[in-house]
Amino acid sequence: MTSSLFRLVCGPAVLTNAPAGWATEMLRDGEVAIVPDAEGLASIHAVARALDATAVAVVRGEDDAAAQERTVMAHAGPLALIWVASGFSDDARAWAQKRAPMTLLIEADGDLPQDERRRVERFVSILSGQAA
């Protein structure tokens, strides 16, 4: 049984381009899985360093966008999900709506703007408050 309250699925830049300490603090009650970018292993190493972690989970790559979304949805399991991607299909949006407050979808290319980081912080704060 996991003690995590949520899972974060995102590209490396969301974490490597965040302010110092933001990702580590935000992930205190969660876990991360990276969707690799064009930099591949180098960007995954950068995430591990940014998190001061010895290992980082990676979401399995798929042949097409629809299959990739299904993999992320399966990875979410019963936990709340923060999912950052450049866009979402109608199927992914419908899935997120069915999960209601358990899912936060954020459309962003590369790093996360400050206003979106605040949305993530509020979401995590709500989850932490419910778990207390």
Task: Label each PLM-derived region with a short phrase.
Residues M1-A67:
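Alpha-helical substrate-recognition element adjacent to the catalytic core
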Residues I44, A48-A132:
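C-terminal cap/substrate-recognition subdomain and adjoining C-terminal extension
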